[in-house]
């Protein structure tokens, strides 16, 4: 599914299987202290990432966490990984074609009570109220969270600093697109200041997916479908509240 919201320049793989996935020794060392469920997620999403890299002609390589726990991709490649219960995905592209990638997957259910007030700007909360009246079948607050996660995965490799949830104002198009405007000075890509991003979203099979591909030529972003077209401590949703976690890069 994830490939439907990313351009043809991007190799994207997703899966719902629970097959055992092997890790390189250096990867096992990097995740050795984690609980079994976390180690399984770490391995499975890297299986998808290596499959996607294979579509670019790149043989299997270790994908270890680097600065800010972000995965270190092979030279000449940009990428992004994500997982949620029952789903995992990875997207990669040549850095000569795409400058940065951000994808996120969430279970299609509303955010826990109080979380929207923590992540949403007043303008965003007003937008969600309007969208909910028109299309109540979509958990718009969770979609907003996912959009902001994809935005962050674009931001961090370019800026190398944290981006708080109020650092970007998101506007969601019910037709399947979204845009994000940085509320402070944006990062630099290909010698140009990036002030806003555009992406796509998909709601299907109990999942919410978001994706952004920041193009090298047509900055600020590539948002067409294929058929027409310092470390962050992530605020992760856990047990009904936001908790700080360093596992947001997958």
What is the predicted function of each stretch?
Residues 1-250:
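Core catalytic alpha/beta fold that binds nucleotide/phospho-ligands
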